[in-house]
From Swiss-Prot:
Known partners and oligomeric status: Component of the NuA4 histone acetyltransferase complex.
GO biological process terms held by the UniProt record: chromatin organization; DNA repair; regulation of transcription by RNA polymerase II
Name of the molecule in the record: Chromatin modification-related protein EAF7
Biological role stated in the UniProt entry: Component of the NuA4 histone acetyltransferase complex which is involved in transcriptional activation of selected genes principally by acetylation of nucleosomal histone H4 and H2A. The NuA4 complex is also involved in DNA repair.
Family, similarity comment: Belongs to the EAF7 family.
InterPro entries tied to this protein: Eaf7/MRGBP (IPR012423)
Comp. bias intervals (Basic and acidic residues): 172-192, 203-213, 281-311
Bias (Basic residues): 256-271
Disulphide-bridged cysteine pairs: none
Keywords in alphabetical order: Chromatin regulator, DNA damage, DNA repair, Nucleus, Transcription, Transcription regulation
Annotated Acidic residues bias: 116-128
Pfam families documented for this protein: Eaf7
Length: 402
């Protein structure tokens, strides 16, 4: 609690700052009229507490905060500038009638229902009439104070101030527009950056998947090339057995013709050709059989080289034919050597000096390697007949003569 300040006696001196504070608060709380005592209480509270109710002053003077003012000090100071009795009369006067340019207001001419009842009553007093007059006069004044009015300032006195005020408003408007445009641009950039980020995030997994697929395909191609390079050459018999047991999965090209799997079984025409060749070999001498073996081995070696270049299906068919031809020729040679009729037939064949059908067949096969790939083709059949059938006819005629 702060120490209680001693009230000053009458005739207290007032500084400039204290007088300014007095008139400042007197504008809000007039110590005159009916409510002058209530207004004086509020005015003394603000004068004695400058820290709680400060006032901005042009000069740097500060009043002493040790002073305590009373109501008598304030009345004495105000009596130097105003006539307090006249001030009370003016403050207590009723509001005068308010007239517009066109005449008295509507409120002065019209009467409310309550006013009509008061006028009609014979027992109405003068006090009631005075109250009605006060109401009629106060209402238009309140309306007048609440209305907005236009006014003009003289250009000579306030022209420069008005120009500066207008320029300041223009500058502020321009700044506000610039800031608004900058904010809009920043928002647009932020939205665009967010969209680009979302697109990049969505594209990244796709690119990763593409890269992974490309890497997998490259690795598969490299592995396939390495396997092709590292696989050793396989003999004809092994390749035939492997191809017969295991199906080969080859990549299908759109430009190449679709391959059809060839069967390894012998057709009737092939079986007839084999029987005819075996009969011809039985007619030949024993000495020529070894030459035929050598020729067959030589022919098989030549055929194996050409068969490697041809397709896998052609290799299957040709290998089986060569093996069967060699086996049957060896069996026929042994039988002809043991039988007595075979020796006679060998002598006849030596005298006749017939051409070797096997060599002709091998030469024809070497000249036309494409027929090996397609055993059942009509061209292959016609050539086989042209090579083998004449020899078979000669052998059958010789047998008939014997």
């Amino acid at each position: 609690m702060s120490a209680v300040k001693i009230e000053s006696p009458r005739g207290q001196t007032w500084s400039k700052v204290e007088e300014i504070r007095l008139f400042k608060w007197m504008m809000l709380f007039k110590p005159a009229g009916i409510h002058k005592h209530f207004h004086m209480v509020c005015l003394l509270e603000r004068l004695n507490k400058p820290d709680q109710y400060p006032i901005k002053l042009l000069q740097s003077d500060k009043g002493s905060s040790d002073k305590v003012f009373s109501g008598e000090d304030v009345w004495e100071q105000l009596s130097r500038y105003y006539n307090l009795e006249k001030a009370d009369e003016v403050e207590n006067q009723p509001y005068p009638e308010f007239y517009n340019d066109d005449g008295p207001t509507e409120t002065t001419n019209k009467k409310t229902e309550g006013d009509a009842q008061l006028d009609n009553d014979d027992d109405s007093d003068n006090d009631v009439d005075n109250c009605d007059e006060l109401k009629r006069n106060i209402i238009p004044l309140q309306n007048r104070l609440q209305q907005e009015t236009e006014f003009e300032l003289s250009w000579e006195d306030y022209g420069e101030l008005m120009l500066e005020h207008a320029r300041d408003h223009e500058v502020e408007d321009i700044k506000q527009e610039e800031t608004a445009s900058a904010d809009d641009k920043a928002k647009l950039k932020g939205a665009e950056s967010q969209d680009t980020q979302v697109e990049q995030e969505s594209e990244e997994p796709r690119e990763r998947e593409k890269d992974i697929d490309e890497k997998d395909t490259e690795q598969n191609n490299v592995q396939a090339k390495q396997e092709m390079a590292t696989t050793p050459p396989v003999s004809v018999g092994e390749s035939v057995s492997e191809l017969a047991n295991e199906p080969v999965d080859e990549p299908v090209d759109a430009h190449k013709k679709p391959r059809t799997r060839r069967s390894t079984r012998l057709t009737r025409s092939q079986k007839r050709g084999i029987d005819d060749e075996s009969e011809n070999k039985e007619d030949q001498p024993h000495g020529g059989n070894t030459d035929e073996k050598e020729d067959v081995e030589h022919d098989t070696e030549g055929r194996s080289g050409s068969e490697k270049e041809s397709t896998a299906d052609a290799a299957d068919t040709t290998a089986t034919k060569q093996v069967t031809f060699a086996d049957e020729s060896e069996g026929a040679a042994k039988e002809s050597a043991n039988s007595p009729t075979g020796k006679a037939e060998e002598n006849e064949t030596e005298s006749s000096q017939q051409p070797r059908p096997k060599k002709q067949k091998v030469a024809a096969a070497e000249e036309v390697p494409e027929d090996l790939a397609d055993v059942d083709s009509p061209a292959r059949r016609t050539r086989r007949k042209s090579i083998t059938k004449p020899t078979t006819r000669l052998s059958s005629r010789l047998r008939s003569r014997k």
